[in-house]
Amino acid sequence: VDFVVQRQHTAWDWTKAEQHGKWIESAYLSGIQRNDKALLDKARTMLKRIVDSQEESGYVGATSKDYRSDERPVRGMDAYELYFVFHAFITVYEETGDKASLAAAEKLADYYLKYFGPGKLEFWPSDLRDPENRHKSIDALSQFAGHGVHYSWEGTLLCDPIARLYEVTGKKKYLDWSLWVVGNID
């Protein structure tokens, strides 16, 4: 959790920054199923540290603030890392009713909705669709949207928890964004 809360990450590697979301979701589910108070207390402490570190903008990943800008609001692998955080926040809310977790999930979703969507940044470079992409060589790394080899399908990762957020909140903007993502898949 220290690695995430310190927000100094600028490298493409995701291995350190995706584990906290997985752990929190698993710890909550295991703690609840086993009625393990010690595990739940530890999970609550870790979750609180992450939620308390969330920036006013809604960003809660490991990437340095100096790296991010309006033109590059996330580091290439943020979507992978934050996918698990989204799920943890929503699962904790669904299992416990913790409103801070729901608020954190909404703030994170709104961060993505602010930067990615119709007329904004996209997860897939529009000139890399068939037939324009035939015989075109591309760099396999993207500064803001993941991995070029799979045409930046990171939006589909985030579509899942953001659609879950729509189911929990009923806020149509989350459904609309998820439909936009799905509608842009070749």
Predicted regions: what they are:
Residues 1-186:
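Glycan-recognition and catalytic cores of secretory/periplasmic carbohydrate-active enzymes
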